[in-house]
A protein has these predicted regions:
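Alpha-helical secondary-structure segments
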Residues: 28, 105-112, 146-152, 201-202, ...
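N-terminal lobe/hinge region of extracytoplasmic solute-binding protein
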Residues: 30-83, 114, 121, 198-200
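A structural "hinge/loop" feature
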Residues: 34-50, 72-75, 102, 156-172, ...
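Aromatic- and charge-enriched surface segment that lines or borders ligand/interaction sites
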Residues: 77-123, 150, 246, 296, ...
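Surface-exposed binding/hinge segments that line
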Residues: 91, 129-181
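Gly/Pro-rich hinge or "lid" segments in bacterial periplasmic/extracellular proteins
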Residues: 167-227, 231
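Ligand-site clamp/hinge motif
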Residues: 191, 219-265
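Ligand-binding "clamshell"
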Residues: 264-276
Length: 306
């Protein structure tokens, strides 16, 4: 596995965002939503869901907005790493609350990691890098006190990589007290969370109509502070040309994932701003170690060099 953070200069991997005039207190976003399978952070693994989940949920740590190569505390107040023991002892912010008003507890962190690994949806491979599997995950997590949780891993990875993994959307912390009562058939509330939210993010779900729209409203109690907007409406607009037209007409404030031709057509238009935003990524390389014709593939030194 290679951990890579994409810089701004890698233009082919950076999405452009176009912003026009915004109606008071409401942001209207035009983008495609047809790829969404679920908005449960333990299952969300498509572009549109990954773009939405961080508005609804937070992690103990997250990439810094201005420099994605750095990790910043969000629900965590501080942490201590023990490379030899392969542990992170994380102290949570004592005043952190979910949108429900419930406090963020070590139990919520443990529940969130256990459910993500046990559900074993498509994004679980990220947490598997730590050596976490359904059969061992419970033994890797421990409540130390009312505001402290210890995270352990069995894989041969550094605390720095462990923190980066815990900053990804699948490591989002959900409100156990809200989710657990909505569980059915041992699904950890997965079916319920496809249409609802239970996080501490800047916004909370008001309504989600698959293939139509997502409506989020401000979470005034978010640990990172209340957002400036009262609501966000994300409309499903599959066609990039239509997204561009909505921007030009002032019917949308933001359009995501426009093609190069759409961006070129908007460059220099009055009242329109094109933005390129860097983001953190993890890239994985797979080597065919069974290839007898190429012994390099089974050489660990080659893996590291690649």
């Amino acid at each position: 596995m290679i951990k890579k953070l994409l810089p701004l200069l890698v233009l082919s991997t950076i999405s452009a965002t176009t912003v026009a005039a915004t109606p008071p207190n409401t942001l209207v976003v035009a983008q495609g939503l047809d790829d969404i399978v679920s908005l449960d952070p333990a299952e969300a693994n498509e572009l549109s869901s990954i773009q939405t989940v961080p508005s609804l949920y937070q992690r103990v740590v997250q990439p810094d907005r201005n420099d994605p190569t750095k990790i910043t505390p969000i629900l965590a107040e501080s942490w201590q790493a023990d490379p030899a023991a392969k542990t992170l002892t994380i102290k949570l912010k004592s005043d952190a609350k979910f949108a429900s008003g419930n406090p963020v507890r070590p139990e919520d962190v443990i529940y969130s990691y256990v459910r993500a690994v046990t559900l074993n949806k498509s994004g679980a491979f990220i947490l598997n890098v730590l050596g976490w599997q359904p059969e061992n995950i419970a033994s890797q997590l421990k409540k130390i006190d009312d505001h402290t949780v210890q995270v352990q891993w069995s894989a041969d990875v550094s605390p720095a990589l462990a923190l980066n993994i815990l900053s990804t959307p699948i490591a989002s912390i959900v409100d156990e007290k809200l989710v657990a009562p909505n569980a059915k058939n041992n699904d950890f509330g997965n079916e319920w969370l496809k249409m609802h939210s239970a996080g501490s993010g800047a916004f909370k779900m008001r309504t989600y109509q698959p293939h139509q729209a997502i409506v989020m409203e401000a979470n005034a109690s978010s640990p990172t502070g209340a957002p400036k907007l009262k609501s966000v409406i994300i409309k499903n607009v599959p066609d990039p040309a239509t997204r561009r037209l909505l921007i030009q007409q002032g019917d949308a404030d933001m359009a995501r994932d426009l093609g190069a031709d759409q961006i070129d057509a908007l460059q220099g238009k009055p009242g329109v701003k094109v933005m390129s935003i860097a983001s953190a990524e993890q890239n994985y390389l797979a080597f065919n170690t069974g290839n007898k014709d190429n012994p390099l593939m089974s050489n660990p030194a080659f893996w590291e060099a690649a």
